[in-house]
Amino acid sequence: MTTQRNTDKPHSKPEDQWNMYNRNPKFKATAKRCSPNLMKDGFQSLSSPVCIEASAVPLPPDSDDEIYFPVPEQTTKESQHEQKVSMKLHEEQDVQAAEHTLYNQYEEKIRPCIDLIDSLRALGIEKDLSLPAIAVIGDQSSGKSSILEALSGVSLPRGNGIVTRCPLELKLKKIPTSQEWKGKISYRNISTDLQHASEVENAIRNAQDVVAGTKGNISGELISLEICSPYVPDLTLIDLPGIARVAMRNQPQDIGEQIKKLIKKIISSKETINLVVVPCNVDIATTEALKMAQEVDPKGERTLGILTKPDLVDIGTEEYIISIVQNEVIPLRKGYMVVKCRGQRDIHNKLTLASAIHQERQFFETHKCFSILLDQNKATIPHLAMKLTNELVAHIIKTLPTIESQIREVLQKSVQELQKYRRGTPTIETEKLAFLTDLIKLFNQDVSRVICGEEHLFGNEIRLFAKLRKEFQTWGLLLLENAAKVQKSIPSKMWKYEDQYRGREFPGFINYRTFEDIIKEQILDLEEPAIVILNNVIRLVEEKFLELTNKHFANFKNLNRAAQTKIDVIRNTQAMNAENHIRNQFKMERIVYCQDNIYLDDLRSTKAEILGKDSGKEISFASVSDKNAIFIQEMISHTKAYFTGASKRLSNQIPLIILSAVLHDFGDNLQSSMLHLLQEREKLNSLLQENSEAAKMRNYLSGRVNRLSKAYQCLKDFSCL
């Protein structure tokens, strides 16, 4: 069915509408302080109340507070007429001045919030994070398009089946009455200026054909429509395709699931306010739109319900509709509103949008049941516009700190990622060697920083030395556990000596061979755990060096592979050297030796410590006689004294061996080996062969860093307002 476009000025009002507002006591005070230009579009309640709620802008005094000036009594009708004309002129000047002040303060407080998010969305920030938005969803024929038409003042595509086939960003901007209507539609790299409201419908249809094709398919690609008019609220909405249950001809059979998937992707974001449109003449509990909103917002914290078609409700069900709007049936934190927009018959009869708003108010004013909703500001398009603007601005202010934090974090990560793709391979042969030299130089610098424990960190990264220290702390705990194990095993070993090996010696004489055996056995138990620590450290160091190759050579697969091969070869060599060194250390440890003065100092300290404790709590002597307790205690003192020195030695020596061979020598040899690549001139072109995806990734990351930097600057500029 073809629709008649409205070629009149958007939102042009019938002449008697001003009188209608004056007749309504609720709007009487407002009418006195608003110019006819603001009144004629039906949005007069938006100009003042929005400022009250969102920016606390003081309004001119109400009618009760009006100031009256004494007027001397006139003697002639002509003088009285002149006085009336003069008073009317002054009144109009006062109204215009008040309007100008309100508009300027409104522009300073409200418009920047919405413009900020619009500018971030225009930069493409939604590719990186979610932005505050109001998404409009509803089943087919729910009245969704009619609401958007009433808010925007323009006709949108209508027809059978799925008409909205792409997300439509509808940016409404209120401008002074002195300026003319203008619009702009943008999609992909196309941007078209619109000179008249009548051009909007065809412009949207053409844009959808380009983005989604001409066969009824849908697309998740955004189309942006900007409308600047004196007769629209300051608001940005995202219109989504209506939820379909049956595919039309030429449409995929799963078109319904495609639409639901697209809708769910957008309304799932916690930054999105979901505007759910439901007709009054259907069971609200069964509507697919509300069901989807409840799935992503179970508590209803960011869902606003809009009831349409109140003129089609069955007689006797009005109270049920009122209970829904009063939030008594399916509670939503943001509540419900009800509106009456143009129907298909109204469009066929060429009813203008302005007249439809006029008829909507008359409907609610005269309805015996629904008039109470008008008194509560829960009905009509103007009140809906006011509600949506306030909700959006409050939501933007609430989420700005989170948005700034997310942009900062994503920007930092993107800059770090871009370092891998800093620039492409030179085309001039003489520059290639210098380019490779720079790459290897930067890589070697990072290796040196790792060796010194001074590498640059991003986010929650942990320095390699911090990881190695944990491994060496584990080694220290193993030594303590081994020393405790020795003390517990001494009584049984001494009993074995008494029972099997003591010959003509008197009881109480310490056998040095037994002492040596105990020491050697416990030292031997530490050798394999030391090798485990070595392997753990090798793995951590290798992972760090491989991470550096991916950081510097990610887009040069041959160079990256060459560096990884060198890391693997050097790793094996250094691991073998370190293991041999550790095993030699334990071979020496099996020689029981200590300087006399050091040993005697440790022995005195050990005996003093033991005497200061209740020896019965230290060791159980149930397996030996009391007469042997003294020389067992003596053996414990000697072994503990020796292990004190040996543990100190091993606690430092094993980590030093590992750090020397596996970190320092590994890193130094890797740097030297990478420099050798510069001498292999015949491999130069092969080493610098760039991956096919590298240039694409570089461009992507550069664009991302660019838009995030601009977005961050926008937020900084906004915070200075």
UniProtKB/Swiss-Prot annotation:
- Inducers of expression: By interferons.
Per the record, which residues fall in region G5 motif?
Answer: 340-343
Q: Does the keyword Transcription regulation apply?
A: no
Query: What are the BP-aspect GO terms?
Result: defense response to virus; receptor internalization; synaptic vesicle budding from presynaptic endocytic zone membrane
Xref: SMART domains: DYNc, GED
**Protein function:** Does not show activity against influenza virus or VSV.
Q: PANTHER family from the xrefs?
A: DYNAMIN (PTHR11566), INTERFERON-INDUCED GTP-BINDING PROTEIN MX (PTHR11566:SF231)
Q: Please report the name of this protein according to its UniProt entry.
A: Interferon-induced GTP-binding protein Mx
Renumbered residue ranges of the record's region G2 motif: 163-165
Source organism: Anas platyrhynchos
Q: Which gene encodes it?
A: MX
| Region (G4 motif) location | 308-311
